[in-house]
């Protein structure tokens, strides 16, 4: 959502910090917060003025008309404040229909004043600009300010100066206070603009001879402007409306939402309720809540929420487990219902999101059965068949009753089933699988001939425009036709999947050439990107610079902007500098409303139509589609969006626009054009803009509008119909009717879906539309029936002529999508069994990285997982780490370290220097671990005694690997060997090979004291003992790891630490290029050459 209410304390804190005015504002920062946990001694220490001044106390919990409700204590001493708070603090209170606990109060200095010194000031945002209201009689009895106050509209990008304030607002204000008031209101407006407020009311504003006092303040800020205002706002809190508690689960989901590109929302309405929802889509979530309330479930509705924007499997798992946890805390005598609903997704992989929900259901299967939960599922969109399949499977395997439905079932039908208002079908009809649409040959089956318009052309010569004359449909310069079969677009953003979807749509519509001419992506250089046009591969240019793209593609008149919310404004502003662009679609959600209004103003000046922000876009069947609109090809074909029908629609929601595609295709001859204007409070183009376009488009025979709670745009349709400007039949339904039934305000999924006054409620708008002559169903459940009824009447009157269906061309399926659907298989080029990075978290040999840290497995444990696919005993992990420590380095003189140093001093980088050192490891340097392990193992396993082994090796003239040291001896032992030997003997369950090697050492050292078991030999034999006797490996596995060189890996890994150390050491010491001295080189040349 966008506009969010803040507490009075937060509002005043920001005001006192950042307002700039010549008026003397008194009592700055003089307020004290009191809660049930307040330490009064500490409070007095922080606010000593509490003891010396008369005080005012009031709740700060977004409660309106506190004075009228007797919730303000005035002119009290500190003891009086405490007495006043005693029966109220922490107690339950009822305000209107809402009941809640009073637990947050504000104490401020009492300001003695007269009624004549009280004024009313309010600033609030609208599409056209910001209204400033002023009334010279403020206070508790101010009354209907809309009717009484002086009002001034400050247009977008305009400034409010003191002279205008005096002239238009301060007409009835006392002369001696006009200057102070003008300065304060001017500063207040600038403060309101700079900190992205959407509503700011002060009542009363008191002006005395001492200065200005802000007594009571109410405010809302645009929460989407957080990235702009973070420095000034700080960590701002948004309290829930009075009567609704702030639950930790709501905060948890809000935190998930903030960290995700997807949208995740949760509001708890009644935690003891019986009916729970988990709905995909901002618009769909409102429709489901409406239907539940319409069918009498308002008192049992437990939550409102939605997930959308393609959340990952892990995100939907976290969201689902939160809801399942909440609904299984308290039992209900009638059991509970979970509605997992949603419209037809445009781009969300339904199977992926459902797999997250299925995981959560499996985890909570015990509590779900215990609480007698029945689950109803309805969804459509990409890969939805697989999603429904896994959902049905989990019902069978867990024994939880789960009823699963797809696009063949009306979206809200499951609500009626869940509440017992309609029967649950035993075998619901199943929609065709994706492959059936995409892989069948065009002529393989006979094509039915449903009703549709007689011609595929955009307009027919025998069509007659409406007879009634009226003002032009669009603002001057804006075209009634946005898209045609020849429309060309530029896509801003590296959205290859969306572009391929547009090209597939173009191909199935039999367009002559692709609709995407170029892409703009400022983060790479100019290049070309490969796409498919049917079977062929084509290249589409990608430009770093928008100017280059526009210059090289003058035929383009549409820009589809996939820029993020932070850059969408700037990129759209830049786009409007090019006269060739007539339509811009802004996909991003979360653009601050103040910036959107600037976009709208410039678009109106330039004659540009903006669709969005916060939209999936729009579609004109047979001609053009924006980005992901209409979903994947299976939905395009199922909803017959490859050719035009007779019905045009406009909605706010992208998901609901796809649902309308489905409803319209099932009840009429199909869609002529459909636009989702976006869920923000100020969409770039309005319902009326598009309705008037449709009215003036000959091919459109009827219009469908899916309105929404919030705003007043739908009333313009009422006026258009009553004044005769709109003559075509209009079917309209405004979603959000349930809002009137809730005791406290609910902000629905879309930023604009919140009524600020009675006229903005869905109920009021539906009633007005009906009275104006618009076809209005009784509920969304009946929308399809009304559309069908109006359509059939038009067919009966001959307005729409049935025509033969023409099959679309076959489009090849993408390989990656076909593989995901399980339609094809191909041998993988690579196989891996140790690590999987594809999911929400990294997995080492089946163990999530979080578990690795939780179990404190350390480097040895991780090495065990990655090298051996085993979770090794703790002593084995410790032994591996000790091996890495003792092999880490052996000074700069050894060949590997020497090479590393030479390379580093030659100016090479770390990787080159490290590699040069590692390349010296072999039989002569570092390779003795493997050789020692193999040699001792072979001797031990063959059954020969140590003396026989020594004699045999001597006879064959071979060295015993792992025996001998240049410096160390039996009299000067190697401490590395001693440490490891002690550890192994103390912790290993058995050490037969180590014992054998030590017996060999006794024989060799009796001949020469430096023929000791060295560190390579000890690690080699001890490692074999570990593999064979730790219990994690079979004998075959242990032998295989020795054969494939696992032991050399220990030396390579350990010594890499030392080599890197030598590299960093040389760089730190700033050593220059090394040249070996001549006197250390013996030049031995052939005699005849030296002569």
UniProtKB/Swiss-Prot annotation:
Sequence segments annotated as region (Disordered): 442-471
UniProt biased composition (Low complexity): 442-457
Subcellular localization: Cytoplasm, Cytosol
Binding residues for Mg(2+): 257, 260, 262
Keywords, alphabetical: Acetylation, ATP-binding, Cytoplasm, Isopeptide bond, Lipid biosynthesis, Lipid metabolism, Magnesium, Metal-binding, Nucleotide-binding, Phosphoprotein, Transferase, Ubl conjugation
EC number per UniProt: 2.3.3.8
Annotated GO CC locations: cytosol
Residues the entry annotates as binding CoA: 769-779
Catalytic activity: oxaloacetate + acetyl-CoA + ADP + phosphate = citrate + ATP + CoA
Phosphotyrosine modifications at: 131, 672
Modified residue annotations for N6-acetyllysine: 530, 536, 544, 938, 958, 968, 1067
Post-translational modifications: Phosphorylated by PKA and GSK3 in a sequential manner; phosphorylation results in activation of its activity. Phosphorylation on Thr-447 and Ser-451 depends on the phosphorylation state of Ser-455. Phosphorylation on Ser-455 is decreased by prior phosphorylation on the other 2 residues. Phosphorylated at Ser-455 by BCKDK and dephosphorylated by protein phosphatase PPM1K. ISGylated.
Binding site for citrate: 309, 346, 348, 364, 379
UniProt GO MF annotations: ATP binding; ATP citrate synthase activity; metal ion binding
Positions where Phosphothreonine occurs in the chain: 447, 629
Gene3D superfamilies xref list: 3.30.470.110, Citrate Synthase, domain 1 (1.10.580.10), Cytochrome P450-Terp, domain 2 (1.10.230.10), NAD(P)-binding Rossmann-like Domain (3.40.50.720), Succinyl-CoA synthetase domains (3.40.50.261)
Activity regulation: Phosphorylation results in activation of its activity. Glucose 6-phosphate, fructose 6-phosphate, fructose 2,6-bisphosphate, ribulose 5-phosphate, and fructose 1,6-bisphosphate also act as activators.
Function: Catalyzes the cleavage of citrate into oxaloacetate and acetyl-CoA, the latter serving as common substrate in multiple biochemical reactions in protein, carbohydrate and lipid metabolism.
Protein name (database record): ATP-citrate synthase
Organism name: Bos taurus (Bovine)
